[in-house]
Amino acid sequence: KEIITQQYPDERPVIAERFRGEVVLMHDENNEHACTGCTACELACPNGTIKIVTKFDTTPEGKKKKALDTFVYRLEMCTMCNLCVEACPTSAIKMDTAYEHSVFDRNKLTKKLNNEGSKIRSGVE
């Protein structure tokens, strides 16, 4: 008889490429992201999982421009529906393949997705 039990955590399952895990804001090696703070993902979320806090930066021309201040993601409320990813006009967020989310403190499930000191990638409008 074939053994089908996996000895987790020693044996990890192979995760499918289209698996929907938690939402992540992608940063490059220069700590830059593509989020403009447009709040399209926040509006698309059916249960208020995402909260975008924006600020106004001044451009070199002296104009005020909306920018991302804080990207708050509440994993405990997320249904992994992918609507936020589909709504993002700059493809700044994606669904990760992480599946281990057990914590003793529920507050650890609320995450700030933008890194400290991160800024918008040049050329993203």
Annotate the PLM regions.
Residues K1-M77, L83-E86, T90-E125:
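Non-ligating segments of multi-cofactor redox enzymes
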